[in-house]
Design a protein with these regions (language model features):
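Short S/T/G/P-rich N-terminal loop/turn motif that feeds into the first structured element of a domain
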Residues: 1-45, 53-56, 77-87
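A short, polar/proline- and glycine-enriched secondary-structure boundary/capping micro-motif
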Residues: 16, 59, 69-73
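A common structural junction motif
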Residues: 27-28, 65-72
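Alpha-helix C-cap/termination motif
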Residues: 41, 64-65
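Conserved catalytic core of Hanks-type protein kinase domains
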Residues: 51-52, 64
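Short, electropositive alpha-helical surface patch
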Residues: 58-64
Length: 87
């Protein structure tokens, strides 16, 4: 299943620096396939796309980043966009 996670964080300089440094070194859980992330410093959010069938991997990923607040959405790829998938 594909997921889009929107992570929000405080926009203070210390938090942003820490997140950027950790992000460069971070290894996604091995159960994540095709993980991609986009970081918006000014907006205080990151968008992460990944594929996994393992709920524990999602939990492990979110606990690795306690300073972030996650909204995670299951999505289905279509020809023109990603569509929200109702569970």
């Amino acid at each position: 299943m594909h997921y889009i996670a929107i992570a929000t964080f405080a926009r203070d300089l210390g938090t942003v620096k820490e997140i950027l440094l950790r992000r460069r070194q971070y290894t996604y859980p091995s159960e994540f396939k095709n993980a991609q992330s986009y970081f918006d410093v000014q907006g205080g959010r990151a968008v992460i796309h990944f594929e996994t069938d393992n709920a524990e991997a999602i939990l492990r990923y979110t606990t690795d980043w306690p300073e972030l607040v996650f909204d995670i959405f299951p999505v289905i790829p279509t020809e023109s966009a990603w569509e929200y998938s109702t569970p």
